[in-house]
């Protein structure tokens, strides 16, 4: 704040006369720069010229410095970049990083900082790979002297009021040092990013949190060096398949991490991120268990020791460069075996809380201080892809960061809802520069500038929503000794936020605002709010009606719920332009191309409300059309079929003829009855000695057959899953899994250990190895397999007439799309868990005639 006041006073001191910008000015863009910087400054110069045109009606030409010659030099100029400032003698020798200046001298204006490209040899990097203090100076100039406000990305995101005069005080020297130098966030547009302090990693190289897969990619090393990868359940495991496990005690892993970091530093980065992968499985080899000594009794402590060693080696090889070590997941707890870090280390604290930052700053020596990685937004926190953060939470977070000297903020998942969360985004960015700014005044400014004559009803709209979000933020209370009071189910939270009363009030406000908007920009912003609100309001309705159905699952309660779900399907169709492809992306928002609706998430993610904690299975993934056609009440009925008998052993290969002709195919749907994304089906036969299963499924390409062996992690690969319960019980059943490799299979049984003192009592016994066979082949895009299960293996005789068993078949598939993900199919659906393919309570019934 002191820097901003100083700059303002310096300008005010010369306010008796001023440089008045008119049509004779030109904007001069430096030509001799790295291409990334050059392109960014050209774009910024054009946007500045456009703002002068829209706000003041001025036609200001943008020219390259190489073309600025002859008669042009007699006209006044707005110079961009450090070169012209140095020639004019207005560049301070100590200006560095994102520090920038606005200077008036002799009628000319200089907007500048020392712009650099993070990787100088990269031919044409995007703006986020550059340090562009000149762009920050341009946004500040537009805010200060044109009264522009950056409310969102792109032209629609700018509010540019009309003015009759643009003037800068003579001798103005406005110097500004942003409080952060590390600001990764979704890069919607450059000027918005700089205005909102979401300008990218700057001079630091960020992997987005995870380094290991870059240092030791499985496609490069696993075949020749499986010893680099974690030993899990007796098997070396490649990185992407099983939660990115590496053998950290192997000295080569430390070397590979070092090589990766040094390579990025040698490319030009001032600092580089070091962080482990996601995942909860770690190498179980004896050397890893002993790594770090007896005091290193957790995986996190071992990782801290490894990461410190890597940083020490970097310090020797590349003095002056920085290693940014992430404190995340296993390393969320600071190290206990040491308190001081090498001279080249800064720490990136994930999930920063008051208690965590206080502990770090008071008890540890970290020479380059702290940056934070925040999870305020994204598709994974509750309540999902609807508005999440209150004004209160934004203000508390930013002010806390300032108290603890945090100099960087990684905004994970930021920017998916520029309509309903617009004021919160604006507030967060503004408070970074001015943490003590009045929150109500900033929110009011947003509403005034975004909605014009519709500001009053829209302030009421946003405040009504904010009061619900504030209560949710207060319930979360991460530092409370009693833990969070927030609902653990996103449906419960959605039902609380969008009650009928709240939703009706918000809608009434929005209707009033839509009738008051005047300009096209205002109408476009309101259209975005409308789309996001209609989506959220429908979710609130679904949540309330689903609660009613669960209390009383009848046709009367199912009908309105089904109506709301069909309404939701229409909303999704509108968002995705009629594209029902699960991996389809939404088109750009009409009239606002910089907006990626709902964070540009694939349809499958929005269908489930988001990822991780935000995921909702039932009822959002129900196939309502199918349910209505079959008169089905979800959770109140089970799939069932009769199993034909045979005296002959059926053949493997021809599932249409021979004995298999006696039975029809049973189709697997999505795990919650939704339309399947992969085709899979099965048949059953009851022989005199064995129970037979024929299963086949489409596979778009040849599967990767690593082979898990007997009782290996079959579920990590393409597989079928079968549950057999002769007693039709959730406590007594057998489970079988098999892969494309017929030797790769798993089995276990539940309920057969009756001693309560046995460690395996109450859980599935995977040490049981039953006698059963699998035949399997992959050919022409089709995986076909046959299982023969002797009755004696499951302690049964050939079932007599009228006998019924609990039974289910599932399929785990890998999507072949660019963003690969797992697909879960099931014969008898699981309406409670979108991943509960092995849930024994979700079983159908097979009858033996």
Locations of the language-model features?
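Structural preference for beta-rich elements and adjacent junctions enriched in aromatics
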Residues: 628-849
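Feature activates predominantly on carbohydrate-active enzymes
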Residues: 43-47, 51-53, 95-308, 315-319, ...
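Polysaccharide-binding and catalytic clefts of secreted carbohydrate-active enzymes
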Residues: 221-317, 322-337, 355, 428, ...
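Catalytic domains of carbohydrate-active enzymes that cleave complex glycans
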Residues: 431-637
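Structured mid-domain segments that build the active-site/substrate or prosthetic-cofactor binding neighborhood
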Residues: 248-255, 349, 355-456, 460, ...
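Aromatic- and acid-rich polysaccharide-binding/catalytic face
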Residues: 337-354
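Sec-dependent N-terminal signal peptides
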Residues: 4-14
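Acidic, contiguous N-terminal accessory segments
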Residues: 11, 17-99, 164-172
């Amino acid at each position: 704040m002191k820097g901003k006041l100083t700059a303002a006073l310096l300008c005010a001191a010369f306010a008796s006369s001023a440089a008045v910008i008119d049509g004779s000015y030109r904007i001069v863009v430096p030509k001799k720069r790295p291409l990334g910087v050059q392109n960014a400054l050209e774009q910024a110069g054009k946007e500045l010229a456009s703002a002068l045109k829209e706000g003041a009606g001025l036609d200001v030409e943008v020219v390259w410095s190489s073309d600025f010659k002859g008669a042009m030099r007699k006209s006044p100029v707005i110079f961009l970049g450090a070169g012209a400032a140095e020639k004019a003698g207005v560049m301070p020798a100590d200006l560095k990083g994102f520090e920038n200046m606005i200077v008036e001298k002799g009628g000319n204006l200089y907007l500048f900082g020392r712009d650099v490209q993070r990787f100088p040899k990269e031919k044409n990097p995007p703006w986020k790979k550059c340090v562009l203090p000149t762009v920050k100076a341009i946004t500040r100039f537009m805010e200060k002297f044109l009264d522009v406000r950056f409310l969102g990305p792109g032209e629609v995101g700018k509010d540019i009021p009309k003015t009759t005069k643009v003037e800068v005080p003579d001798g103005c020297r406005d110097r500004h040092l942003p409080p952060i130098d590390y600001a990764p966030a979704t890069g919607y547009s450059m000027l918005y990013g700089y205005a909102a302090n979401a300008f990218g990693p700057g001079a630091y190289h960020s992997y987005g949190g995870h380094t290991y897969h870059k240092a030791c990619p499985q496609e490069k090393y696993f075949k020749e060096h499986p010893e680099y990868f974690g030993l899990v359940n007796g098997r070396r495991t490649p990185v992407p398949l099983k939660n990115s496990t590496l053998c950290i005690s192997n000295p080569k892993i430390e070397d590979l991490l070092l090589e990766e970091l040094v390579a990025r530093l040698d490319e030009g980065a001032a600092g580089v991120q070091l962080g482990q992968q996601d995942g909860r499985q770690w190498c179980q080899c004896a050397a890893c268990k002993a790594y770090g000594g007896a005091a290193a009794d957790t995986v996190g402590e071992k990782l801290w020791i490894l990461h410190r060693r890597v940083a020490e080696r970097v310090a020797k090889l590349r003095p002056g460069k920085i290693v940014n070590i992430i404190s995340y997941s296993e390393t969320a707890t600071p190290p206990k075996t040491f308190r001081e870090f090498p001279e080249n280390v800064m720490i990136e604290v994930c999930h920063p809380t008051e208690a965590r930052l206080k502990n770090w700053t008071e008890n540890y020596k970290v020479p380059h201080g702290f940056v934070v990685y925040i999870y305020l937004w994204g598709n994974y926190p509750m309540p999902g892809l609807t508005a999440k953060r209150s004004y209160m939470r934004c203000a508390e977070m930013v002010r806390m960061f300032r108290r603890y000297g945090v100099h960087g903020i990684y905004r994970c998942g930021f920017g998916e809802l520029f309509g309903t969360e617009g004021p919160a985004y604006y507030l967060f960015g503004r408070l970074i520069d001015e943490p003590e700014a009045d929150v109500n005044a900033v929110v009011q400014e947003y509403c005034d500038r975004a909605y014009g004559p519709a500001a009053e009803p829209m302030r009421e709209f946003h405040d009504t929503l904010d009061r619900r979000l504030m209560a949710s933020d207060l319930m979360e209370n991460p530092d409370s000794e009693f833990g969070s009071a927030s609902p653990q189910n996103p449906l419960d939270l959605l039902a609380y936020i969008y009650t009928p009363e709240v939703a009706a009030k918000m809608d009434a406000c929005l209707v009033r605002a839509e009738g008051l908007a005047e300009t096209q920009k205002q109408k476009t912003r309101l259209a975005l709010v409308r789309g996001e609100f209609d989506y959220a309001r429908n979710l609130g309705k679904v949540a309330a009606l689903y609660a009613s159905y669960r209390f009383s699952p009848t046709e009367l309660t199912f009908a309105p719920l089904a109506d709301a779900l069909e309404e939701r399907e229409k909303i999704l169709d509108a968002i995705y332009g009629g594209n029902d492809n699960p991996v389809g992306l939404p088109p750009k928002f009409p009239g606002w191309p910089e907006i990626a609706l709902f964070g540009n998430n694939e349809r499958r993610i929005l269908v489930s409300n988001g990822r991780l904690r935000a995921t909702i299975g039932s009822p959002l993934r129900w196939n309502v059309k199918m349910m209505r056609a079959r008169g089905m009440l979800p959770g109140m009925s089970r799939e069932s079929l009769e199993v034909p008998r045979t005296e002959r052993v059926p053949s493997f290969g021809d599932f249409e003829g021979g004995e298999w002709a006696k039975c029809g195919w049973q189709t697997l749907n999505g795990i919650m009855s939704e339309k399947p994304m992969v085709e899979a089906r099965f048949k059953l036969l009851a022989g005199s000695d064995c129970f037979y299963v024929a299963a086949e499924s489409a596979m778009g390409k040849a599967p990767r057959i690593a082979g898990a062996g007997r009782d290996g992690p079959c579920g990590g690969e393409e597989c079928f899953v079968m549950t057999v319960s002769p007693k039709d019980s959730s406590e007594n059943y057998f489970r079988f899994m098999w892969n494309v490799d017929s030797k790769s299979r798993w089995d276990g049984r539940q309920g057969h250990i009756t001693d309560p003192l046995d460690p395996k009592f109450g859980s599935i016994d995977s040490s049981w190895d039953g006698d059963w066979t699998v035949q399997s082949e992959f050919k022409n895009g089709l995986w076909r397999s046959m299982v023969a299960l002797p009755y004696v293996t499951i302690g049964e005789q050939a079932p007599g007439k009228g006998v019924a068993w609990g039974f289910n078949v599932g399929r785990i598939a890998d999507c072949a799309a660019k963003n690969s993900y797992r697909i879960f199919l099931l014969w008898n659906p699981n309406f409670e868990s979108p991943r509960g393919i092995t849930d024994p309570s979700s079983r159908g019934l097979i009858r033996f005639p």
